[in-house]
Design a protein with these regions (language model features):
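Extracellular/virion structural assembly segments
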Residues: 1-190
Length: 190
């Protein structure tokens, strides 16, 4: 199931959450240990929607039963490559879970640092951490959460994030005459 694309959000906020343990000694020395998990939170805001625009969005949200159901969302603007890449990007060789350098081919143009990508065999979305022009090594973070096989398709335009509602309580406000304001908080499903 896909989140409605119309109307578009007035604003989108994407947050990266890493699972780390952090301790600080009395002398001020800090130790940090990564638990290896990373996921994104997405906050979308709508301002001044007419009832005819708002009703289908809120009906979709209600159908998710709070945080029970999973669905996909393609955030506007940031879900597509900013470097003008074309073609079908694929893995060139297999890669194991934890790898953050992925050999790729099958496309031309540029994938830029900050672009999002998704591998065809699982739902996790990754961020590119260094520009890559055509075949070569794609640097991503976090490291792969699942192994990928040779020739696995990598989506870099209209990247779908698999999410659920972060909160079980959803509320909206009505301002002026028939103008709805609504904010939705989503969390990436791992």
């Amino acid at each position: 199931m896909s989140y409605p694309t119309d109307p578009e959000f007035a604003s989108v906020e994407i947050t990266s959450r890493h699972s780390n343990l952090r301790t600080e000694t009395r002398s001020g020395r800090t130790q940090v240990r990564s638990l290896g998990a990373q996921r994104r939170a997405i906050k979308g805001r709508y301002n001044d929607l007419k009832r005819s625009e708002f009703a289908p969005v809120f009906a979709f949200v209600m159908a998710q039963k709070g945080g029970v159901e999973e669905f996909t969302i393609v955030p506007p603007v940031v879900s597509s490559s900013s470097g003008g890449a074309v073609g079908t990007m694929r893995t060139n060789g297999s890669h194991t879970a934890g790898d953050s350098t992925i050999t790729v081919d099958g496309f031309s143009g540029l994938i830029k640092a900050g672009d999002f990508v998704k591998f065809g065999n699982h739902d996790k979305v990754y961020m590119v951490t260094a520009d890559q022009s055509g075949a070569g090594t794609l640097n991503i973070q976090p490291g792969l959460v699942e192994a990928v096989a040779n020739n696995e398709v990598i989506t870099y335009n209209s990247v779908p994030f698999t999410v659920r509602l972060e909160n079980d309580i959803q509320e909206w406000s009505l301002s002026g005459f028939d103008r709805y304001n609504f904010e939705i908080d989503l969390i990436e499903v791992l």
